[in-house]
């Protein structure tokens, strides 16, 4: 999607140019409350607003003295770091808050466009790490202080399939490869750098295959790269985003795709995918946890930073976190402890009752949870996938 044009450039012009080495404004220079209500331009590169927009709107309604207006825009994750760099090089910070997955986080850290939030502003988030669920706290550590986790889920990797065409789901990577060979062009996953299910599959395979070092895509993934190259012989193309794989599953152009808990539940709720599809796990199963973050670009004014820090702290309150159950998009969703489905809006409770799968609770409790790759390693993994596996077949039907 194209970015919304003309994002309150007048207000944003008060932001200073970047180039401070990633440091946020001096914490002492950022007031507890802005001197006057601010306007914020929020860029979502992760589909995160589906989970958090109501939290943000609730904050705006409760704190008109902090926030006067919010403008939302969306963009693909791979475009985020370049957009922020162009703004900061031009001395005009038009984007004030980014909602991103680990992909945008990794790219933003790599190109130096994000402000350091922690430990600089730890005082604005009392007991942050203790309040997170344990696997969510590990996902927060991946930020290196350049963001604050707002939602979390165990993710996958899951196989999602049409049971009419796949009577018995593959129970291991070898069985998946055998199935793909026997049914060429009927299995698919999306480009990992722009797809939660795609990168969860990529990062989960080293555990499934018993690779040498699951945290080192460069030197420890020999089995994974060989497997993906072999599997790729039977994949027609790699869509540039997850939604296309869902539509292809629904239309019958493919019969099996990679998925996650949220990408299974939410498209069935929306009707994108028929409610008859099934999911399965491969063994030895390891969840690869996923999260989405609030990222603050460099070059903002102290008032803007003040408002954003208050907003993020608000989003981490348990009553706001309960909104993250949403329609199962990031199931379960809450990053902080002790936020139950019973605390969620009735609509969310109804959705999970109708479209959730009882086995997910059992699987989440039963199998080990591994964090996504750290930022630098994730960028390496995406680059290597583009070179070795699928770069020439992305989006080309």
List PLM regions with ranges.
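C-terminal motif of bacterial Sec signal peptides marking the signal peptidase cleavage site
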Residues: 10-13
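Extracytoplasmic ligand-binding site segments that recognize negatively charged/polar headgroups
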Residues: 45-54, 77-78, 94, 100-244
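Bacterial signal peptide processing site
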Residues: 15-18
């Amino acid at each position: 999607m194209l970015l919304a044009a003309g994002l309150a450039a007048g207000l944003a012009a008060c932001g200073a140019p970047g180039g401070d080495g990633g440091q946020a404004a001096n914490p002492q220079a950022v007031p507890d409350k802005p001197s006057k209500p601010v306007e914020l331009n929020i860029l979502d590169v992760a589909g995160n607003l589906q989970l958090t927009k109501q939290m943000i709107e609730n904050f705006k309604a409760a704190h008109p003295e902090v926030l006067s207006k919010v403008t939302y825009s969306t963009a693909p994750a791979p475009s985020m770091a370049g957009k922020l760099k162009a703004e900061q090089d031009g001395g005009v910070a038009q984007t004030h808050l980014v909602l991103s997955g680990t992909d945008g986080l990794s790219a933003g850290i790599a190109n130096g466009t994000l402000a350091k939030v922690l430990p600089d502003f730890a005082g604005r988030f009392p007991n942050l790490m203790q309040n997170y669920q344990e696997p969510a706290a590990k996902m927060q550590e991946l930020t290196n202080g350049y963001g604050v986790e707002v939602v979390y889920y165990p993710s996958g990797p899951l196989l999602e399939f049409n049971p009419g065409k796949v009577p018995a789901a593959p129970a291991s990577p070898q069985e998946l490869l055998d199935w793909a060979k026997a049914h060429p062009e009927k299995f698919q996953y999306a480009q990992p750098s722009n797809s939660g299910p795609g990168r969860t599959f990529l990062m989960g395979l080293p555990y499934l295959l018993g690779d040498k070092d699951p945290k080192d895509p460069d030197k420890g993934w020999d089995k994974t790269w060989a497997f993906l190259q072999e599997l790729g012989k039977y994949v027609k193309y790699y869509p540039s985003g997850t939604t296309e794989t869902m539509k292809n599953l629904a239309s019958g152009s493919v019969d099996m795709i990679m998925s996650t808990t949220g990408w299974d539940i939410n498209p069935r709720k929306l009707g994108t995918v028929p409610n008859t599809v099934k999911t399965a796990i491969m063994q030895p199963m390891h969840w690869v946890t996923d999260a989405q973050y609030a990222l603050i670009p460099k070059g903002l004014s102290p008032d803007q930073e003040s408002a954003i820090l208050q907003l993020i702290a608000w989003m981490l309150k348990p009553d706001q976190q309960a909104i993250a159950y949403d329609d199962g998009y990031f199931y379960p969703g809450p990053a902080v402890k002790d936020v139950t489905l019973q605390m969620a809006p009735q609509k969310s409770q109804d959705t999970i009752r109708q479209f959730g799968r009882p086995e997910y609770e059992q699987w989440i409790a039963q199998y080990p949870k591994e964090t996504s790759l750290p930022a630098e390693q994730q960028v390496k993994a995406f680059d290597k996938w583009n070179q070795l596996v699928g770069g020439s077949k992305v989006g080309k039907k």
